[in-house]
Amino acid sequence: MITCLPLLAGEGARRKGDIGMRNKNKRLAQYATELRRNMTDAEYALWYHLRNKLFCGIRFNRQVIIGHYIVDFCSRKLKLVIELDGIQHVEQEQYDLERTKFLTAQGYKVIRFWNDEVLKNIDNVLEAIYVEIEHLSPPHFGSSPHKWVEPRLEVLK
C-alpha cells in the first residue's frame, strides 16, 4: 500500500535551497556575460581564430560555465577547455590546480597558455590546440597539421 502525505511548507516545486542555487547560477551567468563583453587582448586574439567554427570546423564558446567555474574557451563536443593565464595566475596556482582537477573529473581536457604566448606567438598556440583536437577527434580529422583553418570561398560582387 502506498500512502501519499501532503507536502510540508516549503516543499514542492520551489525550495529555499533551489532559489539560492538559481541566484548563484544567475550571478555566475551575469559575470560570464560581463567577461565576454570585456575580453583581454589575448582572449580577443585567440577568439578571432576560434569563433564561428573557423578553427578546424570545431565550435568553441567563450566564457563557458562548467560547474561553478567559468572557463575561457570550450568545445563541449570535444570536451576541450582552453585557458589563458595572465600574471595573476602565478599567485593563484592552487586555485587553478583545483579548477583543472574539477574539470578533468568532468571529462574535460584542459590546456593552458600564457597571455604573452598568445599575443607574441599565436601560430604556436594554434598548432598546440590543433594537436589536442587531433587527439580528441575521430581518426578522419584533418589532413595537414599546418592547415588548421578550413578555406572559405568569398563571393565578390
From Swiss-Prot:
Cited SUPFAM superfamilies: Restriction endonuclease-like
InterPro entries linked to this entry: DUF559 (IPR007569), Endonuclease_DUF559_bact (IPR047216), Restrct_endonuc-II-like (IPR011335)
Stored Pfam families: DUF559
Paired cysteines (S-S): none
Family: To E.coli YcjD and H.influenzae HI_0925.
PANTHER family noted in UniProt: BLL0828 PROTEIN (PTHR38590:SF1)
Protein name: Uncharacterized protein HI_1162
Organism: Haemophilus influenzae (strain ATCC 51907 / DSM 11121 / KW20 / Rd)
